[in-house]
């Protein structure tokens, strides 16, 4: 505090007296409440800054505590939007099921209830918006979309606080909670090297290569610049025959002793070209839950679900609605899991 500056805390009521409006109006304007006009919100925020107003963090914490303890219906529900053509398919993936479980448990812990809404011919985005608005559901969670994207039309995102899981949800460009895929790639490579593997290859699909591949390539560079195996990208345009052909050619040319992949059917693909796991080649995956191998990364999916709920509740508490100008990404580090598809290499110390 500058010498001569008053030590008295500036309050909401002080700002209200200066502007000749009610303290309720000032409070709402400072919270970006859309019931207050943009011009007045801007004026209140400008004057409050000039007067040296700072929110009392203890009062804010008390307010959030009271809101969490209240049995009133306001803010009592959060929406989980399932857009999959076959709705049960979403949670058939163990990763995504744990997203739901973590989110559901965290919502209950915080005094909310998480409800699933399935989009279909009857539950259109327009109808969904009316239901959410009528029930005062202010928070939306968007789980992974798979291969399809939703045509949201004129959905009014500015009325809702929204968080998406991962990068398959392209629209809306809301805040994101997901696994730290670059870190997971590096964790995987380092642990494969720890187990004695020296010729570690990466096999991926185009949409996943950049995310997981960066950590893998950095790990490869750190380990030994003289051993470089280019990642094999199995493009969507390949038919089954082409996939097996390019896989076999890559294996013959680079002779990896272990493979890191995000393709769940990789073990079966290797078997079909005559490579047994783990006898001929070790195998690790980016998801030990859905990846088709028991060695690799546990993405801590339940924690991702919890974090998504914490983020959306924070947005509600701060009245931050709509598609943000600056998107925040909350990344959860995975952990390595040893497994039988990637046994320790005998005599690795000599390698």
Locations of the language-model features?
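Bacterial carbohydrate/catabolite-sensing allosteric modules
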Residues: 1-4, 14-18, 49-51, 56-57, ...
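N-terminal helix-turn-helix DNA-binding module of bacterial transcription factors
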Residues: 1-67
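Generic, well-ordered alpha-helical segments
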Residues: 36, 70-73, 95
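Charged, helix-prone or intrinsically disordered regulatory segments positioned adjacent to compact structured domains
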Residues: 67-76, 80
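Extracytoplasmic/periplasmic substrate-binding proteins
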Residues: 92
